[in-house]
Amino acid sequence: MRDMIWTYRALNNPAARRKWTAFILLIVLAGFGYTAYKIAGGAEVGKSLIAAAIFALFISLYAIITLGKPRHYYIEGDYVYYRPFKTNLKDIEGFEVDEERRVIRLKGAGIFSVRTLYFDNEDDLRQAVRRLERIVKR
């Protein structure tokens, strides 16, 4: 039995939306930079621009899917899970709540663990804060 489950979409959370938008823009800029490099190196302009346009189309579709995809977190016992990561909440040093951006940052979480918890609504955020306070204080 899971203690708490919540879902968020990156499109509905300002912090997650900003993170994913920056990542997607970085990919698009890298693609267009590579196209400019190929054209400067003497590649055929028409073919290069067609390839860049197709690349931009696929990245745009990826962005739409990524921003709209529901992501699930759950707290079970002393662990928080976000596939494929899990974090033992007793091992963290504390957490920081940003209610405006609906984010909880776990301090002291390892590199292969959940470090940021995103939320769509403030009710889930408050509920998670209460559960985290109980677990971290033990």
Swiss-Prot record:
<protein>
    <recommendedName>
        <fullName>Uncharacterized protein AF_1999</fullName>
    </recommendedName>
</protein>
<feature type="transmembrane region" description="Helical">
    <location>
        <begin position="48"/>
        <end position="65"/>
    </location>
</feature>
<keyword id="KW-1003">Cell membrane</keyword>
<keyword id="KW-0812">Transmembrane</keyword>
<feature type="transmembrane region" description="Helical">
    <location>
        <begin position="21"/>
        <end position="43"/>
    </location>
</feature>
<dbReference type="GO" id="GO:0005886">
    <property type="term" value="C:plasma membrane"/>
</dbReference>
<keyword id="KW-0472">Membrane</keyword>
<keyword id="KW-1133">Transmembrane helix</keyword>
